[in-house]
Protein backbone atom coordinates (compact mmCIF):
# COMPACT_ATOMS: atom_id res chain seq x y z
CA UNK A 1 0.00 0.00 0.00
CA UNK A 2 1.32 3.42 -0.90
CA UNK A 3 1.88 5.73 2.04
CA UNK A 4 0.52 8.66 0.12
CA UNK A 5 -1.39 9.41 -3.04
CA UNK A 6 1.12 11.91 -4.38
CA UNK A 7 4.19 13.93 -3.54
CA UNK A 8 2.64 17.35 -3.97
CA UNK A 9 5.02 20.08 -2.94
CA UNK A 10 2.92 22.91 -1.58
CA UNK A 11 3.27 25.82 -3.92
CA UNK A 12 0.67 28.39 -3.09
CA UNK A 13 -1.36 29.03 -6.16
CA UNK A 14 -4.81 29.45 -7.59
CA UNK A 15 -6.43 30.65 -10.80
CA UNK A 16 -7.62 34.22 -11.39
CA UNK A 17 -11.18 32.93 -11.05
CA UNK A 18 -12.83 29.69 -9.94
CA UNK A 19 -12.58 28.06 -13.34
CA UNK A 20 -9.95 26.61 -15.66
CA UNK A 21 -9.76 24.96 -19.06
CA UNK A 22 -8.60 21.35 -19.04
CA UNK A 23 -7.35 19.14 -21.85
CA UNK A 24 -7.62 15.35 -21.46
CA UNK A 25 -4.96 13.62 -23.54
CA UNK A 26 -6.93 11.52 -26.07
CA UNK A 27 -4.27 8.82 -26.52
CA UNK A 28 -4.43 8.07 -22.80
CA UNK A 29 -5.72 4.80 -21.34
CA UNK A 30 -9.54 4.74 -21.56
CA UNK A 31 -9.93 3.94 -17.87
CA UNK A 32 -7.95 7.04 -16.96
CA UNK A 33 -9.84 9.18 -19.50
CA UNK A 34 -13.09 8.02 -17.92
CA UNK A 35 -11.80 8.64 -14.40
CA UNK A 36 -10.76 12.19 -15.28
CA UNK A 37 -14.11 12.86 -16.97
CA UNK A 38 -15.96 11.61 -13.88
CA UNK A 39 -13.70 13.58 -11.52
CA UNK A 40 -14.29 16.74 -13.58
CA UNK A 41 -18.06 16.16 -13.50
CA UNK A 42 -17.95 15.62 -9.72
CA UNK A 43 -15.98 18.82 -9.11
CA UNK A 44 -18.22 20.80 -11.48
CA UNK A 45 -21.33 19.55 -9.64
CA UNK A 46 -20.09 21.17 -6.43
CA UNK A 47 -20.55 24.62 -7.97
CA UNK A 48 -17.35 25.79 -6.26
CA UNK A 49 -15.07 25.42 -9.30
CA UNK A 50 -15.67 24.82 -13.00
CA UNK A 51 -13.45 22.75 -15.27
CA UNK A 52 -14.13 23.41 -18.95
CA UNK A 53 -12.91 20.55 -21.14
CA UNK A 54 -11.20 21.80 -24.30
CA UNK A 55 -10.18 19.86 -27.43
CA UNK A 56 -7.05 21.90 -28.12
CA UNK A 57 -4.10 21.57 -25.70
CA UNK A 58 -2.90 25.08 -26.58
CA UNK A 59 -6.16 26.43 -25.13
CA UNK A 60 -5.76 24.52 -21.86
CA UNK A 61 -4.74 25.77 -18.42
CA UNK A 62 -4.52 22.19 -17.13
CA UNK A 63 -3.39 19.05 -18.96
CA UNK A 64 -4.66 15.69 -17.68
CA UNK A 65 -2.15 12.97 -18.47
CA UNK A 66 -0.72 9.62 -17.38
CA UNK A 67 2.61 8.15 -16.38
CA UNK A 68 4.04 4.71 -15.67
CA UNK A 69 6.72 5.16 -13.05
CA UNK A 70 7.70 2.65 -10.39
CA UNK A 71 10.62 4.73 -9.16
CA UNK A 72 8.21 7.11 -7.46
CA UNK A 73 5.89 5.89 -4.70
CA UNK A 74 2.90 7.91 -5.84
CA UNK A 75 -0.39 7.05 -7.54
CA UNK A 76 -0.72 10.51 -9.04
CA UNK A 77 1.10 13.75 -9.52
CA UNK A 78 0.30 17.43 -9.95
CA UNK A 79 2.95 19.79 -11.27
CA UNK A 80 2.20 23.47 -11.31
CA UNK A 81 3.90 26.54 -12.69
CA UNK A 82 3.01 29.57 -10.64
CA UNK A 83 3.60 33.27 -11.11
CA UNK A 84 5.43 34.02 -7.86
CA UNK A 85 4.35 37.68 -7.85
CA UNK A 86 0.62 37.14 -8.33
CA UNK A 87 0.55 33.65 -6.71
CA UNK A 88 -1.55 32.56 -9.67
CA UNK A 89 -1.10 29.36 -11.63
CA UNK A 90 0.28 29.64 -15.14
CA UNK A 91 -0.29 25.98 -15.95
CA UNK A 92 -0.81 22.66 -14.20
CA UNK A 93 -0.19 19.11 -15.41
CA UNK A 94 -1.84 16.25 -13.54
CA UNK A 95 -0.87 12.64 -14.04
CA UNK A 96 -2.27 9.29 -12.97
CA UNK A 97 0.34 6.57 -12.48
CA UNK A 98 -0.32 3.23 -14.21
CA UNK A 99 2.41 1.57 -12.21
CA UNK A 100 0.11 1.46 -9.18
CA UNK A 101 -3.39 2.27 -10.39
CA UNK A 102 -3.41 -0.31 -13.21
CA UNK A 103 -1.60 -3.07 -11.29
CA UNK A 104 -4.06 -5.59 -9.77
CA UNK A 105 -1.56 -6.25 -6.94
CA UNK A 106 -2.26 -2.77 -5.57
CA UNK A 107 -6.01 -3.35 -5.64
CA UNK A 108 -7.20 0.02 -6.89
CA UNK A 109 -10.89 -0.09 -7.75
CA UNK A 110 -12.23 2.21 -10.46
CA UNK A 111 -13.81 4.32 -7.72
CA UNK A 112 -10.41 4.84 -6.08
CA UNK A 113 -8.88 5.80 -9.44
CA UNK A 114 -11.63 8.43 -9.77
CA UNK A 115 -10.82 9.66 -6.24
CA UNK A 116 -7.14 9.88 -7.20
CA UNK A 117 -8.13 11.97 -10.24
CA UNK A 118 -10.33 14.16 -7.98
CA UNK A 119 -7.35 14.57 -5.62
CA UNK A 120 -4.99 15.65 -8.39
CA UNK A 121 -7.62 18.03 -9.77
CA UNK A 122 -7.95 19.37 -6.21
CA UNK A 123 -4.27 20.33 -6.40
CA UNK A 124 -4.94 21.87 -9.83
CA UNK A 125 -7.63 24.02 -8.18
CA UNK A 126 -5.15 25.07 -5.49
CA UNK A 127 -5.98 22.80 -2.55
CA UNK A 128 -3.26 21.34 -0.36
CA UNK A 129 -3.18 18.06 1.55
CA UNK A 130 -5.22 17.78 4.72
CA UNK A 131 -5.49 15.06 7.34
CA UNK A 132 -9.22 15.63 7.74
CA UNK A 133 -11.78 13.37 6.04
CA UNK A 134 -11.27 14.79 2.58
CA UNK A 135 -10.48 13.99 -1.03
CA UNK A 136 -7.22 15.83 -0.24
CA UNK A 137 -5.99 13.29 2.33
CA UNK A 138 -2.38 12.46 1.46
CA UNK A 139 -3.04 8.71 1.47
CA UNK A 140 -5.48 6.11 0.36
CA UNK A 141 -7.86 7.62 -2.18
CA UNK A 142 -10.74 6.21 -0.12
CA UNK A 143 -12.54 9.56 0.01
CA UNK A 144 -14.29 11.42 -2.74
CA UNK A 145 -15.04 15.14 -2.65
CA UNK A 146 -16.43 16.10 0.78
CA UNK A 147 -18.43 19.15 1.91
CA UNK A 148 -15.25 20.43 3.62
CA UNK A 149 -13.45 20.29 0.24
CA UNK A 150 -16.18 22.39 -1.39
CA UNK A 151 -15.91 24.87 1.49
CA UNK A 152 -12.10 24.98 1.13
CA UNK A 153 -12.43 25.84 -2.58
CA UNK A 154 -15.06 28.49 -1.86
CA UNK A 155 -12.80 30.05 0.79
CA UNK A 156 -9.76 29.91 -1.51
CA UNK A 157 -11.59 31.78 -4.27
CA UNK A 158 -13.39 34.34 -2.11
CA UNK A 159 -10.24 35.37 -0.22
CA UNK A 160 -8.68 38.55 -1.56
CA UNK A 161 -5.01 37.52 -1.52
State the predicted function of each range.
Residues 1-161:
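Zinc-dependent metalloendopeptidases
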Amino acid sequence: VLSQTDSHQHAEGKWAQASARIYIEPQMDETFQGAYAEAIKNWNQTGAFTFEVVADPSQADIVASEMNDGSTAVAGQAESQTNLLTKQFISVTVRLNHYYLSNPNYGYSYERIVHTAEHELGHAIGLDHTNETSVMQPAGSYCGIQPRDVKAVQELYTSSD
